[in-house]
Amino acid sequence: MNHAIVEQIERRRASIIGFLAGLVRAASPNPPGDTRRVADLIAGRLRATSVDFQVLSDEPRKPNIVARLGAGRPELLFTSHMDTVPVGNPKAWRHDPFGAELVGSRLHGRGAADAKASLAAMVAAMEALGTVLPLHGTLTLTAVSDEEVGGVKGTEYLVDRGILHPDHVVVGEITANRLATAEKGVLWLRIVTHGRAAHGSTPWEGSNAISAMLRVLDAIETQVGGALRGMTHPLTPPPSLSIGTIRGGVATNVVPDWCEATLDRRTLPSETIPEAVAQVERVIAELHRADPTLQADLEVIQSGPPIETPLDAPIVQAAQAVARRLELPDAPVGYQQASDGRFFAERGVPTILFGPGQPELAHTVDEFVDVHDVITAAKFYALLALRMLGGADERS
């Protein structure tokens, strides 16, 4: 059966690549996050198979597709996202960002790697598996919206409404077809400093909120950033802290009474989100104790815990076996960015990441994916599903 599935995917190579090209041409930058064209293409593809699916959403522009094969437990979830980051300056691109140009084996375009390649491969795997029913359990595929801006209308929507109850999760993200078992957590913070407005010619009559913010940010970078230096994890990159935005003031000749900054903090699997928040809270509290006139508020914009799936988890063991079958590296790696996997990992569901595309190409100009890697990923997903849900013969 394994050989037959691999051969079936190989025979459909041109169709799979053409499907991916169509997904790339269906622009879905977020913001605004309208993924209806992508969802229509996926729905059309699934409609031509034996796969049952639903389109679920509480916002029409941001649909989510939930497709299922088989029934009962265990449930294996394949998930990836339909939205992309914006193009930026189109003139900076050598290839039309929505042209899906195939140059050699490279298919170019926004979302080609992140993450429409994974989507195309997962759909192809489900198509192939639809010919070998019954499975011993359920294979679920979700093609979600809103991942690039936090997943509220996508995976979080599906999880919070009890639509998904997987026992194992595979997140389609750009890992260069490497098995990733760990991922850094994400924490976005907003800091607001308060001052007192005055005329720019008499700043001593006011209190400058931007100056206060500079003190706050300098202390955070020095103390929190300093504490992060030297921290490591065997799989993920180091923890990080970055000032993302800053704004304040209304005019050059007015002492600003308000300033806002946002921070991007990425945590190691060995850290917790509450600990990371407390680090920043302590810095602000110390500044206020030293100078009670300094007023700063801290708010969590969004957060997601890190992922670290044990290497003896069945999904990891199965993924390693499939990687060896396809002559791929089987040593686990870490994933640098954040993914929708956090919604499952925080609920204790064993979660891994795997997908075609080089991680360094995410969100870049002239993004591309090697189509050979897309076909390999489709084979990986299909063989993994067979190993998890195909019965004892397929696990041997």
Predicted regions and their residues:
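N-terminal helical capping/dimerization or prosegment-like subdomains
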Residues: 1-90, 105, 258-262, 279-282
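Short helix-capping segments at alpha-helix termini
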Residues: 49, 131-135, 163, 286-293, ...
